[in-house]
């Protein structure tokens, strides 16, 4: 088995907090120097690299003299603001030794949920890569709340991979990779060297939360791989403690767990819809509509809508769920939530008489719909 990284041209590398900090006590300059050296090597063999790096909050805690990660959101935001300065400085310094420029890019979910901002972020990152710059990406923890509380850089790494149409995502952690069970508790646990991303059994194998410094456990990595696979990108989960792990992966050595994308890429527009983490509304659809969407590739008509939940405007991305609450698709709605409630369970021929106008005969056209 050969590493998929060997054939990848554009790679997103996510480095966890434990790999860039001294056990949470500020940044580990020597470790960051090693990451810069390895990425410089990848650049020298023609690969484009985007780095998603944790460590800002840990560095901020060190600079502020805090021993334990705070629970208050405003304190976490303050630590992130202070620590981001140090993180940017050390990366700039270390990459500068190889004549490589870096760029700091801080993102929030709102940046990727809005279509115009999404395209702007994409254009900026692709321009940076074309200029030979290594973008250093992190969540903009200073201005958001839910990302600090529930977010993680594994998910961000997958979103960035999809954003730039990357070939591969490398998630570096302090663990070897994925096991069938927790090897610390189960002596019969077997190592998983390769699997298809999105396989349901993988989520059952994955454990819970991460360290007290970081936020992501193995489950977040499995879900990140599943998300990245929707754009056709393969994911490697490997130990960042392995010597020269990035260089060895690029040389084709099989290290860690490879989660392969089972399908080709979604179109850019559908990828944007699939990557929405927060939706303002959803529609519950009947069994017939579920069948038409999942098997027939049809549009969603108002007559198939049983219930409208949430408040949304025309042009927003909403979820389509079955009677069991499971999301089957999502797409751009042609009608607001108020309008959708009025035309639900009605044939398209009655839309104009009910609303006084007709935007489209479909609630969501199949060209603006993606299965999940």
Curated annotation (Swiss-Prot):
Binding site for substrate: 54, 141, 153
SS bond partners: none
UniProt keyword annotations, A-Z: Amino-acid biosynthesis, ATP-binding, Cytoplasm, Kinase, Nucleotide-binding, Proline biosynthesis, Transferase
Pathway in which this enzyme or protein is active: Amino-acid biosynthesis; L-proline biosynthesis; L-glutamate 5-semialdehyde from L-glutamate: step 1/2
SUPFAM superfamilies associated with the record: Carbamate kinase-like, PUA domain-like
SMART domains with a match to the protein in the record: PUA (SM00359)
EC id: 2.7.2.11
Main function: Catalyzes the transfer of a phosphate group to glutamate to form L-glutamate 5-phosphate.
NCBIfam families: proB (TIGR01027)
Protein name: Glutamate 5-kinase
Lineage, opening ranks: Bacteria, Pseudomonadati, Pseudomonadota, Betaproteobacteria, Burkholderiales
